[in-house]
Regions:
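Multi-pass alpha-helical transporter architecture, strongest
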Residues: 180-188, 382-410
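Helix-to-loop junctions at the C-terminal end of transmembrane segments
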Residues: 61-75, 272-286, 370
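Short amphipathic helix-loop junctions that connect adjacent transmembrane helices
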Residues: 21-45, 242-259
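Structural signature of the two symmetry-related core transmembrane helices
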Residues: 78-93, 288-303
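Juxtamembrane intracellular "pre-TM" segments in multi-pass secondary transporters
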Residues: 1-7, 192-228
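A membrane-interface helix-boundary motif in multi-pass transporters
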Residues: 41-45, 160-176, 368-388
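Glycine-rich segments within core transmembrane alpha-helices of 12-TM secondary carriers
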Residues: 137-158, 352-362
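Hydrophobic core of transmembrane alpha-helices in multi-pass small-molecule transporters
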Residues: 90, 101-119, 312-326
Length: 410
């Protein structure tokens, strides 16, 4: 294994986790819903749900097509760099969003999250190039663990600005961290073969390739079943991440400083979860690890419905963090285990398609139920539990994902 490339790959997880933590999960999410929109009657929940759903929908439509183009034309790296730069730019521009600027904040939220998620398609596709199947679980776990450390660093960097009421400074600091720690990946990750197909020709053939890939997935039962299950349960994970900060601030009265501290504690527990489950993912198989953590997630959202105090929510958040690290790392390793050679970028495009198109529904469900209930977020969070239960039932039908190194294509 190329140690330098693996280090650069994990540092990118450190970088993009700044966006995930500060923008998507805590500061910008709460600032937009509560200050920019105002959450009277659940209006902020509804608008933030639209930000998440529209951006994820764009990723769902484009990611498999762009993944196919990357494989055929050998332009994975330029697309990876370009989408990262777009996400960094959108993050910096969030400093211009003031209370009442609902549409501008919506546009930047959609643009930033779309670019962030699109870059992840190419980032994830590097995993089979960096490690053999027997080590992909632990390398994936290392990446998520370093990513959680990046979340903590970004929140600590933003905290002084938030305490001073300088949200613009917090967003600028996040953009700077995102850019700086992305640079090693730009230069050290292995370059795929270039010039196999001209870019324009690859673009013309991309649509046909997407259809062909879909048919090939349908012909591989375990791959098809895994992606179907992932479609459902990742919807629940993304929705909880998108709304947990707003739920804590609105329903339980967390101030912004305490919300940041809460998220840091969650990241520490998630880091522990990712590291603790890295080797068991290889030994037990990613299928079993994902199923265990889905049971954990279902119990967590039910418990969240009944939480009444901030102390209870602190305890629940720690438990949720360990499950977050495990389910994300094991799911990525699961797909790497199932991906036939030569289809990695395209299949990770479908991986993103399943997770992000499903996330179109979850945020709309939460926001819609909260708004219909006059701002009662407890009903919304309880409804998300169904995504974990259904995902678990579907995943139980997947036979692969144990100790076998890779499922052969047919």
């Amino acid at each position: 294994m190329n140690v330098r490339a693996i280090v650069a790959w994990t540092l990118y997880d450190f970088a993009n986790s700044a966006f995930a933590a500060v923008i998507f999960a805590t500061i910008y999410a709460a600032y937009y819903a509560l200050a920019v929109v105002g959450n009277d009657g659940g209006a902020g929940d509804l608008w933030w749900g639209r930000v998440v759903s529209v951006s994820m929908g764009l990723v769902a439509v484009t990611s498999p097509f762009l993944g196919g183009v990357a494989d055929r034309a050998g332009i994975r790296r330029p697309l990876f760099i370009g989408f990262t730069a777009l996400a960094v730019t959108a993050t910096a521009l969030m400093s211009t969003v003031a209370p009442g600027m609902v549409v501008w904040g919506f546009v930047l939220g959609v643009l930033g999250n779309f670019a962030y998620e699109s870059a992840l398609v190419y980032y994830n596709a590097y995993l089979p190039d960096l490690a053999p199947p027997s080590h992909q679980g632990r390398v994936s776990g290392w990446g998520f663990a370093v990513g959680y450390a990046g979340s903590i660093a970004a929140l600590l960097a933003a905290l002084p600005f938030v305490k001073a009421g300088n949200y613009a400074g917090a967003f600028f600091a996040t953009a700077a961290l995102y850019a700086a720690f992305s640079l090693p990946a730009f230069f050290m990750l292995p370059a795929p073969p270039s010039g196999r197909v001209p870019v324009l020709r690859a673009a013309r053939e991309g649509g046909a390739q997407v259809v062909a890939t879909a048919r090939r997935i349908l012909a591989l039962p375990d791959l098809r079943r895994f992606l179907g299950a992932y479609f459902i349960y990742e919807d629940g994970v993304n929705t909880v991440i998108a709304f947990s900060g707003i739920f804590a601030a609105q329903t339980l009265g967390f101030p912004m400083e305490r919300l940041i501290a809460l998220y840091i504690v969650v990241q520490i527990s998630a880091l522990i979860g990712a590291l603790a489950w890295a080797r068991p993912t290889d030994v037990l198989g990613p299928r079993r690890v994902v199923m265990i953590t889905l049971c954990q997630w279902a119990a967590i959202v039910v418990a969240a419905y009944f939480v009444q105090t901030q102390g209870q929510f602190w305890a629940l958040a720690v438990v949720a963090g360990t499950g977050l690290g495990a389910v994300q790392a094991a799911s990525r390793a699961f797909l790497a285990r199932l991906a036939p050679p030569g289809m990695e970028a395209e299949l990770f495009g479908f991986y993103s398609l399943c997770g992000k198109s499903a996330a179109v529904m979850g945020p709309l469900v939460f926001g819609g139920i909260s708004h219909a209930a006059g701002g009662n977020q407890r009903a919304g969070i309880l409804a998300i539990g169904s995504f974990f239960v259904v995902g678990l039932a579907l995943l139980s039908r997947v036979k692969a994902g144990g100790k076998a190194p890779r499922v052969a294509s047919s």
